[in-house]
Amino acid sequence: MKLHELRPAEGSRKSPKRVGRGTGSGLGKTSARGENGQNSRSGGGVRPGFEGGQMPLYRRLPKRGFTNIFAKKYTAINIDRLNIFEDDTVVTPELLIEKGVISKVYDGVKILGNGELDKKLIVKATKFSKAAAEKIEAAGGKVEVI
């Protein structure tokens, strides 16, 4: 076999539908749109969710709940992510952003207790879970709420 003898696998290369190019092509005249009706027209068709005039499902179901505009949004981070720092480092939200551990601080940073911490760190954050605070102190570190 030579390079010029290579051929694509059978059925892997399909030519596109060229509609409206004469009746002999099989896709002439109505261009595979059927006869008359909304879908045969330019720009025809119904919007998503339209059920032919029947009250659509999204309007039959009741509205529920509301958005609390006073809700605080904390950036959550597990303590196993803090193992990248050296012993006795003061870990602040600014340092976490600088090191790429988190990308953005909204209303503060909350430290969660998933994983293990091997380093002795001074961690400054807005909130701590009970498990996270215990694990930081067990590793010889300090917890400071800012």
From Swiss-Prot:
It comes from the Bacteria. One of its GO terms (cellular component) is cytosolic large ribosomal subunit. Signal peptide: none annotated. SUPFAM superfamilies: Ribosomal proteins L15p and L18e. One of its GO terms (biological process) is translation. Residues 1-55 are annotated as: Disordered. GO terms for molecular function: rRNA binding; structural constituent of ribosome. Residues 42-52 have a biased composition (Gly residues). Residues 1-13 have a biased composition (Basic and acidic residues). Pfam families: Ribosomal_L27A. Gene3D superfamilies: 3.100.10.10. Keywords: Ribonucleoprotein, Ribosomal protein, RNA-binding, rRNA-binding. Part of the 50S ribosomal subunit. Belongs to the universal ribosomal protein uL15 family. Binds to the 23S rRNA. This is Large ribosomal subunit protein uL15. The gene is rplO.
